[in-house]
Amino acid sequence: IHYMYTRGDSAWNNEAEACIGGYALMSSEKIRLFDNLSKRTVEFGVLLNETDASEVSNNHVERVKNPRGKPSLDTEGKGIFIYGGGINTVEGNSFEACDIGAGVAMGGEGTVLHNNRFVGNRLQVRYIGSSSVEWSREGVGNYWSSYQGWDLNQDGVGDIPYQPNDSLDRLFWLYPQSRFLMDSPLVVFLRFITAQFQLDKGKGIVDSNPI
């Protein structure tokens, strides 16, 4: 499904499988994309490009993989790719087993993501930008299978923020041959130190209320 230069449309209960891309919303406004399935696509599950005032909710995206994708060209498969300006809401979706869970570039910071699930993606987020971006709303963030924090008061919200695009992630992006170290005790310790001293504060995407 490809929306371009449209306004006020809706798409639901669709399935996209084994194709180049799932659902593309481009240069459009007030689109509702909900309760759809996308699996085994190559480039993206959901694309938001220069789209505004739209809602992407309760969709399930899995296994977006580009066998020819190159990190240096940002051509890997993305569960959701947000490119260009616009203020949109992305909530209640699941992005699983993709090359990249969410890609954000060139002014996509206005879109708010909360109450989504990012599970088993090789890289959870790739953000190309320098702004500080918050991915939670009213105390509700997202679920991250790679979150290494804790919830001591057992309220269902992590006690420390999750930064899926921190300095270590950017290092692994630049040097993919070092990915085998991602879950090592040393990297876990370095992430802890980075969080304690707020070394990455004000940089990139932050989920202050991971669930």
Give short role names for the model-derived ranges.
Residues 83-92, 96-112, 119-120, 125-126:
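Membrane-proximal low-complexity regions enriched in glycine and acidic/polar residues
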Residues 107-211:
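Acidic, glycine- and Ser/Thr-rich low-complexity intrinsically disordered tracts
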